């Protein structure tokens, strides 16, 4: 079983979850505890613009740090990769100016010998596009797909597809229809109009 931990400290520049704000000392202590548990990585241990502290954390621990889903544009992720702020960039095409920019981020990460694990792409069509990118990258071991049933079941995000992807034993097949592989369910369009 692969376990990753998301501290969710990069969502905004303010404390959006009262009582859950991490400082450097808390991030360091937690990272050391997670190392002992063989957790694969610690995602977003500090606010997204605390680059110096995240890089310092990377130097102090062996557990990789991941993040970047809320950083905007290629320029922000380029800086994070160059300065070793995140070991595993986790771009999100809905924030990063689309699939073309996401593709560039994956190539950049590969050039720096880093894994790249995109976020879920907002589900629906973005999720299908992310799935194709992950399948084409040798440095993408998997793609993050939110699944929090019953309300946040990943299948809800793909309900507009005539051919929704299914997760089976932790794997999801790439959609095979032309383009991004997505076929929109015409009944969904008619029911929403």
Label each residue range with its predicted role.
Residues 1-55, 60-61:
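Metal-dependent enolase-superfamily TIM-barrel catalytic cores that perform enediolate-based chemistry
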Residues 15, 101, 184:
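Short acidic, gly/pro-rich beta-turn/loop elements at beta-sheet edges
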Residues 38, 47-67, 71-171, 175:
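Shared catalytic-loop signature of beta/alpha-barrel
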Residues 178-193:
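Extended hydrophobic packing segments that form well-structured cores
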């Amino acid at each position: 079983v692969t376990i990753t931990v998301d501290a969710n400290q990069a969502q905004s520049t303010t404390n959006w979850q009262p009582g859950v704000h991490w400082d450097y000392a808390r991030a360091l202590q937690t990272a050391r505890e997670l190392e002992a548990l063989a957790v694969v990585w610690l995602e977003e241990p500090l606010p997204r613009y605390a680059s110096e502290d995240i890089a310092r954390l990377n130097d102090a621990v062996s557990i990789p740090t991941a993040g970047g889903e809320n950083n905007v544009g290629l320029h922000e992720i380029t800086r994070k990769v160059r300065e070793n702020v995140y070991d595993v960039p986790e771009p999100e095409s809905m924030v990063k100016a689309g699939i073309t920019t996401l593709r560039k981020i994956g190539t950049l990460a590969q050039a720096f010998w880093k894994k790249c694990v995109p976020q879920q792409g907002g589900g629906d069509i973005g999720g299908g596009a992310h799935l194709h990118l992950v399948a084409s990258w040798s440095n993408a071991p998997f793609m993050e797909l939110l699944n929090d049933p019953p309300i946040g079941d990943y299948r809800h995000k793909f309900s507009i597809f005539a051919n929704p992807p299914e997760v089976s034993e932790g794997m999801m097949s790439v959609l095979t229809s032309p383009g991004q592989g997505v076929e929109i369910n015409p009944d969904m369009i008619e029911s929403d109009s």
